[in-house]
Amino acid sequence: MYDYLVVGAGISSAVFVHEALKVGKTCLVIDKRDHIAGNVFCEEIEGINVHKYGAHIFHTSIRRVWDYVNQFAEFNNYINSPVAIYKDELYNLPFNMNTFAQMWDDVRTPAQAKAKIAEQVAEAGIGEPSNLEEQALSLVGRDVYEKLIKGYTEKQWGRDCKDLPASIIKRLPCRFRFDNNYFNDRWQGIPMGGYTSMVQRMFGDVEIRLNTEYRDLIAAQPDIAKRVIYCGPIDEYYDYKLGRLEYRSLRFESELLDEENHQGNAVVNYTEREVPWTRIIEHKHFEYGEQPKTVITREYPADWQPGDEPYYPINDERNTALYEHYEKLAADEGRVIFAGRLGGYKYYDMDKAIDAAFDLVEQELGVKIG
């Protein structure tokens, strides 16, 4: 009998397993996919680490997280500086002085940019915003909204901005300096050699069974472990008996191109509604690759259906209430602990997922990290 059966071979599981092995616990890791590393899995194609489930850029201001991951990989100095394309016009992201100078010919200083935005906000004349469109207009005015927010957001959610709640956008940060660094965090980069190698080092020599369903294993060996760390969907664990939690999903189309450099940037967003994909990722630029070929991936938002890969929890009133009911069931579990993005029905950046795993390690193993 193992001390722990760990369901899911992603980054949260890897942290827990690494620490459990250090204190002498035995673990079995299973995953229904045919690979480890969850959604940060990278596949090498023509010497390029391809992010199979969308772009993953590591960024954090949590020192203990940064120190921890650097035990398992050397990180490069990649800075996320995406570009947006709207009707063949190029704009830097996030919204900063470069963006405003590209958008308005008469804007060159922070004072001019602030005045232009204030003028357009006043023209919109929004009192209390009743939907996402009104919220955005009340924050940044019509030009930024129409060119960089409206179409992209409608593709992401599959609904018109007038039909989306204002609460989705609580604020729209505008930087009144020439700074294209998307994140504000202290540390940022990509693990050299890809995320899969990093996660493999975290797991060490633990036993991992891929293409393995939790239900099948437990049906055959109900007493295989004393405790279960379950990083799968919490509603699936309970056979959806209270109802299904909802997600937004994604679809990816990757293409190997016989050219050295396709778009000159790792991430290019397409913000007009008429272009069906939301962005194109050119993976080699994450690691400053100079390979003779390149791999690009078009990313399409998708309505989630049972059986699809769940990406983003829809934390609206209905789903939040349903998750809380499942959480009450989970509180009565004797040996099962729910963890990770799917177990907790919560979207995590990678650093927050790792930090939450640290808390689990402390709670379950009595080991404090950092």
Predicted features along the sequence, with ranges:
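Short, well-ordered alpha-helix to beta-strand connector turns
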Residues: 2, 24, 206, 224-226, ...
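Dinucleotide-binding Rossmann-like beta1-alpha1 core, especially the glycine-rich loop
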Residues: 46-122
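Active-site/ligand-binding neighborhood in enzyme catalytic cores
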Residues: 87-91, 97-226, 231
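C-terminal segments that line or cap access tunnels to active or ligand-binding sites in enzymes
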Residues: 236-370
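Short hydrophobic core segments
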Residues: 5-7, 30, 223-235
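Short, solvent-exposed loop/turn segments at secondary-structure junctions
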Residues: 11-12, 34-35, 98, 154, ...
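N-terminal Rossmann-like FAD-binding beta1-loop-alpha1 element of flavoenzymes
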Residues: 2-29, 361-364
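Glycine-rich FAD pyrophosphate-binding loop
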Residues: 21-46
